Amino acid sequence: MSSAEVTAAAKPADAPEHCPGTASESAGKASACAGCPNQQICATGPKGPDPSIALVKEKLREVRNKVLVLSGKGGVGKSTVTALLSRAMAQHNPDRNFGVLDIDICGPSQPRVLGVLGEQVHQSGSGWSPVYIEDNLSLMSIGFLLGSPDDAIIWRGPKKNGMIRQFLTEVDWGQLDYLVLDTPPGTSDEHLSAATFLKVTDGRWGAVLVTTPQEVALLDVRKEITFCKKMAIPVVGVVENMSVFVCPKCATESDIFPAKTGGAERMCADMEVRYLGKLPLDPRLAKCCDEGKDFLAEHAGSPTVTALKGIVARVQEFFETDRLTCTCVKRVLT
């Protein structure tokens, strides 16, 4: 392990920002420990790294790329973008394997969106087996563990963190080229847990942020970008969802959510992150999500599908282009 990995491994997944680490002499005693759910355990327990970190690293050793889908604002289409992104990559790369992990613990929607609502997770000797949507696309969600889709999950942070830890250590993903994680809105327990665990795994990882054009959404996405920078999460870029409405009859574009301050593209320029592209609003997409149908197959000629292809290409470029080579080439050219 590198020194950075050791530092990360010495902090619980639900630790506060300035946690001294479980191996520190001030563990459970520092001012940053006040209010932490682990304070008493750290103060009295043996000093050492969180064993879950090594477990996660081992379990995900065959997962090449991890994609966090984030947004500070709810209702902007994170789950829809997660489903579209994973389906598109799986269909365009039939010889590769993809997985979706739904860590929106209190509002799991991927089972419905991906058309496997009501399926059950099976236990094997190597852990939980994810539910397969296609031969090369699988899903794990707490939605599969509920007795009814109407059941409410009323959990505090530590229990959510424990569930995410369980997903990352007990699901038998096998070899994956991409694992796409659907997250809840905000910058809270689920995001901290996922970032803490993923940052020490092998391979590449990064965050795709989703927004809509209006300022009320951009305001929270700016905070999410700041969160990523503070947590050292590589930012793949920003997707502007529901950017325009394209009339299916005459192809005329209408701004349903007018961008008052330049929209996501201007925000990306200001905050120095990549603008991945915009997805037009299509009512047929909402219908497909509700019914668990594959929008890409049902409406292959939609402007949304055309735009999605460009976004998928840019996401895969981030993970599969040798960044060191690109940097060196850029320096030579300049």
UniProtKB/Swiss-Prot annotation:
Biological processes annotated in GO: iron-sulfur cluster assembly
Binding site for [4Fe-4S] cluster 1: C19, C33, C36, C42
Pfam families: ParA
Cofactor (UniProt): [4Fe-4S] cluster
Free-text remark on how the cofactor is bound: Binds 4 [4Fe-4S] clusters per heterotetramer. Contains two stable clusters in the N-termini of NUBP1 and two labile, bridging clusters between subunits of the NUBP1-NUBP2 heterotetramer.
Residue positions binding [4Fe-4S] cluster 2: C247, C250
InterPro entries: Mrp-like_CS, Mrp/NBP35_ATP-bd, NUBP1/Nbp35, P-loop_NTPase, YlxH/NBP35
Gene Ontology CC entries for this record: cytosol
Disordered: annotated segments: 1-24
Keywords, in A-Z order: 4Fe-4S, ATP-binding, Cytoplasm, Iron, Iron-sulfur, Metal-binding, Nucleotide-binding
Transmembrane segments: none
Compartments it resides in: Cytoplasm
GO molecular function, one term: ATP binding
Residues that bind ATP: G72, K73, G74, G75, V76, G77, K78, S79
Function: Component of the cytosolic iron-sulfur (Fe/S) protein assembly (CIA) machinery. Required for maturation of extramitochondrial Fe-S proteins. The NUBP1-NUBP2 heterotetramer forms a Fe-S scaffold complex, mediating the de novo assembly of an Fe-S cluster and its transfer to target apoproteins.
PANTHER family: CYTOSOLIC FE-S CLUSTER ASSEMBLY FACTOR NUBP1, NUCLEOTIDE-BINDING PROTEIN NBP35 YEAST -RELATED
Stated family: Belongs to the Mrp/NBP35 ATP-binding proteins family. NUBP1/NBP35 subfamily.
Subunit-level organization: Heterotetramer of 2 NUBP1 and 2 NUBP2 chains.
Identification of the protein by name: Cytosolic Fe-S cluster assembly factor NUBP1 homolog
Species assigned in the record: Culex quinquefasciatus (Southern house mosquito)
Lineage: Eukaryota, Metazoa, Ecdysozoa, Arthropoda, Hexapoda
